[in-house]
Amino acid sequence: VWVNEKGMPEICGVISEDGKSLQVSQKDPLGRGLLWEQDLSFLVVYPDGGTEDVQVSFGKEQASCLKELKRQASEGCFVMPNADGKGYGFFRLLEKDAKACLGNLPACKDEVLRGSLLITLYENLLNRTIPAELYMEAMLDYLPTENNSLLFSAALGYIGNCQRFYLADPEKLELVLWRIVTMAEQSQQRLQAFRQYRSIARSPEAVGKLYALWKDQKAPAGCSLSENDYISLSYDLAIQMPDKADEIVATQ
């Protein structure tokens, strides 16, 4: 299956109704009945903040697995799938788990788990199990708190794609990105945020701000822009400001 067949499994981990076990299932989304043999890690988070790491092993012909929990899960518990980031597949989230995972991103100290959650949440956005508005709101709360450069870059890309794919109101996104451009401690984060801001800016205020910046050739403090950045900015401005397009192109 791993080498010779296309696609990947759809995996879901659900706490049983009695709260005593975690039920993990896999299925072939292409309807061929294929099963993937692999070891998976799930993190059950309890209302008091305690966690339980649940290891699941799928055999060659195994579509589901039931693992008994050490503690009985109650209302408020949720599941973080693929906790070690080693699993292969689309980890479908229940609505309550998706909301909880999004809300817990800023407080998650484990960088591997945080990176895995970013991928899982983004894939659930693309598969429309998470509303774009909910995803964007939570990610914008999380992004300014991320200090890991790789995770920041990944999250920034996911947020930009969400804006482009689902055409959300850009106002809060523009505000958060500009705040990072002007206030982030890491210069690389400032530059990355500026480039994303440039690509998604749609409001008259944001476009006007970029036009003034380009015209004066004056980058925000602590944000070093290259000649290519100004060239790319001129292209975006020419599209956003058609009445000034000829002037912008000629000047650049």
Regions found by a protein language model. Name each.
Residues V1-Q252:
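Non-catalytic accessory/interaction domains
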